[in-house]
Amino acid sequence: MGAMAVVHPSRSGEIADPPAWERLAAGFVLFMLTGALLAPVLAPDQSETPILRLTWLPVYALTAGLMALRFERIIKAWPAWLLAGLLLALAFASKYWSIDPEVTQRRVIAMAINTSFALYLGAVFRDSALPRLLMQTCLVMAVGSLIMVFAYPQIGVHQADNAGMWRGLWYEKNQMGLVMVVGAVSAAACLAAGDRRPWTALIALGLCSLLVLASQSKTSLLCLLLGSGFVGGLWALRRGGAVLTVAGLWGGVLLAGGAAWIWFVDSAAVLTALGKDPSLTGRTLIWESLMRRVAERPWTGYGFSAFWGRDSVPAAFVRQETAWPVPSAHNGWIDLLVQLGWPGAVAVGVVIAVAVVLVVLRLDGMGAREGYWSGAYLAVFLLLSLSESVLLNHASLPWTLMLAILSRAVIFDAPQKSAALARAPSEAYGNRLRIASDYVNGPARRRPVRLL
């Protein structure tokens, strides 16, 4: 009998779940990227202090060590490195026309290091390992937020503006809400991927969702519904077969089309129904003022991370026109326009589009193994970019995870290998299988054993 072979799924050189110490190190960097605890304690007025900058030095050293350790792995994401490198080059070049070149240069360096960590994260934490890491990290921060709310309410609960609303380990309730959305969506993805510890995922999903509600952030609530609905919908379609899949896709297209039509026809009524000010709490006034600043420098912007400085003249015009100390554009795309102009906005849009296309094309493979986390997070990220400044940031969790998705999407799984089983025994040492007709005198019979 010839050799037999069976196909075993194998990912040569890939790590499905890195060791505990590496998960702990990566989780610490993610914790720092959320701006939790240290920033509110060391800089309660939200200013950038020298002490706060020093806290990032261990993060940068840790990132360098992780990069060196996994260099052979992360270099496989070279298309993502090229795309991210182009964005970094554009941001660095903007220092030559920036209204605050020192800040631009310093933050480009910080963004380069954190971009490296993002690409490492996507290349090393494959399949469900990344949503599991995010779920565990956010679960720890959720417990920490509860401690702050009940033990140290002066930090964990808003005292002046938005008094009584929970903010946990962060400056603002929206920050807590968005981090908890990441935790909840990651927990849902772990459940959809068949995580080996479903109870941990269920606890994380429940606690993170509870904190989203406690933050009373409507943007976070919409993101939670979108992300968890994306994961749950695709999981149900995959389990339901072809008929349910086709029906679900058609239903999704009709629902999305209907929602878009209602929004364009009467967006004010939609916002009123959601309990939101039709002017988006004055944000439309901010956007109108900012677009006038964009018209003054449409091709260059005012320099990466330079527009919102305390001594910024164009930002002072915006604050004067809106009669409000505006901290940001509250829109990722407009914020990008005032920093890098239309070239920067188009470049970032192309990078995000590449990530979206790759994730959609790999939904049946990578998507199923990770519990559809990448697609769900991209949907949340795109929605979030319309109301928060989350694009091309030098140190933020949303942009880091977007780049991590790009990194994991450009690395294709290693081909399956065939592992040969043991060869059949030779004629000298083994007997081949026989059937009844092989015996000359008919089927072999055994005499019954007789007991005395």
Language model regions located:
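Aromatic-anchored transmembrane helix interface
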Residues: 55-59, 80-87, 101-123, 133-138, ...
